[in-house]
Amino acid sequence: MSKKLHIKTWGCQMNEYDSSKMADLLGEYQGYTLTEEAEEADILLLNTCSIREKAQEKVFHQLGRWKTLKDKNPDLIIGVGGCVASQEGKAIKDRAHCVDIIFGPQTLHRLPDMIEQVRRGEKAVIDVSFPEIEKFDRLPEPRAEGPTAFVSIMEGCSKYCSFCVVPYTRGEEVSRPSDDIILEIAQLAEQGVREVNLLGQNVNAYRGATHDGGICTFAELLRYVAAIDGIDRIRFTTSHPIEFTQDIIDVYEDTPELVSFLHLPVQSGSDRILTAMKRGHMAIEYKSIIRRLRKARPDIQISSDFIIGFPGETKEDFADTMKLIEDVAFDHSFSFIYSARPGTPAADLPDDVDMEEKKQRLAILQDRITQQAMRYSRHMMGTVQRILVEGPSVKNPMELRGRTENNRVVNFEGQPKHIGSFVDVEIVDVYTNSLRGKFIRGEDEMDLRRNLRPSDILAKHKQDDDLGVTQFKP
């Protein structure tokens, strides 16, 4: 009988990426196969997130449900990973005795060893250290699961915003070597991946070592990735305004593989609140970045994060946020009511904004951004959009679903052979969360591919010709 593994994941795309690597790791080295049913599993792993309110309580509620499974099967191994594990450490075991393994985001690569320790009789195996970027050196080769893939390029954050736990749970910023990232993406491209999403808590702070002892900036990395044959779209998540430098903006001007969509969190439009949040920039500086971006890429769509009801936020502060939303014309947002995270500087501030007021402000903000998004979607009516077909439509399996460059889902009638490739569709209808398309042409009528193997890019470097034009040559 095959050994079964069940992973429950909460939180950001980085956690989703980490969970996929856990599955690959335990599958390759220990022969575990994934199951959706916790009752079938020999190992249960909970990959946690500490961003939301009452994150710890949510973890213990889940562990309570899993305890009943362990009572029936004493050989069942239960592990807790992610940011709550990093934050709480041994306290998780003290409260939930059913837990065997506690590991942090930076130590998931040690899971096979931890499992063996438990099998040998150790009562609790805990490792929530920050061993630089070691975890990427011990993970198996990437495995594509469709035409899109996430690739982690760095870990941690060194900005220490007053409300955020990330520096304490994932550590300081550490970048992967650029050659390792390029190799991983080249391997994914050879498996049919067409779009990559570069992941990090603050990707534009990326400064990765090169094979010759130099440093690769984020802008340079974007150009290297764009040169890999088969990679026709590049996204990245998440970035910080204070390091969104001109060289990154320049990439938007000359690199069509970089999509016309950017998630750039601002959190608030009030300079007073931005200062209290320790964001390191003012609203006018954020707008300057957007202005320069739209000069380089006029059709780019912008999304953001917003925290509503941060300590001390007045009606005037909220009005400043709404003014920024109107000025920038945000297309989408992840907006949340503020709740204090234990151990952060903001947790010591009085939470003095009434909850009903917070809820009202959140509803107003979300309504405004929904209106702006619908306005732009209507402008897309009648246009031809190139979409990457990801699979069957969620609502109608007889149809196909894809995503536009500006991150809108499009459902259309098409043949299964188009899954994993690009098609052009005419937008014929607009809904709140999706668009309706009419098939125009398939990829065989486009000129997208180059006669290069993805591995060829590993030997390339940037070189300027006599006219100052940048090229990538062997």
UniProtKB/Swiss-Prot annotation:
Reactions performed catalytically: N(6)-dimethylallyladenosine(37) in tRNA + (sulfur carrier)-SH + AH2 + 2 S-adenosyl-L-methionine = 2-methylsulfanyl-N(6)-dimethylallyladenosine(37) in tRNA + (sulfur carrier)-H + 5'-deoxyadenosine + L-methionine + A + S-adenosyl-L-homocysteine + 2 H(+)
Single GO MF descriptor: metal ion binding
Pfam families: Radical_SAM, TRAM, UPF0004
Residues binding [4Fe-4S] cluster 2: 157, 161, 164
Residue ranges annotated for the MTTase N-terminal domain, each copy included: 3-120
Amino acids binding [4Fe-4S] cluster 1: 12, 49, 83
Note on how the cofactor is bound: Binds 2 [4Fe-4S] clusters. One cluster is coordinated with 3 cysteines and an exchangeable S-adenosyl-L-methionine.
SUPFAM superfamilies the UniProt entry points to: Radical SAM enzymes (SSF102114)
Keyword Iron: yes
Known EC number: 2.8.4.3
Domain Radical SAM core: 143-375
Entry's Gene Ontology cellular component terms: cytosol
Subcellular location(s) of the protein: Cytoplasm
Subunit structure: Monomer.
Role according to the record: Catalyzes the methylthiolation of N6-(dimethylallyl)adenosine (i(6)A), leading to the formation of 2-methylthio-N6-(dimethylallyl)adenosine (ms(2)i(6)A) at position 37 in tRNAs that read codons beginning with uridine.
Protein's UniProt name: tRNA-2-methylthio-N(6)-dimethylallyladenosine synthase
Native organism: Shewanella sp. (strain MR-7)
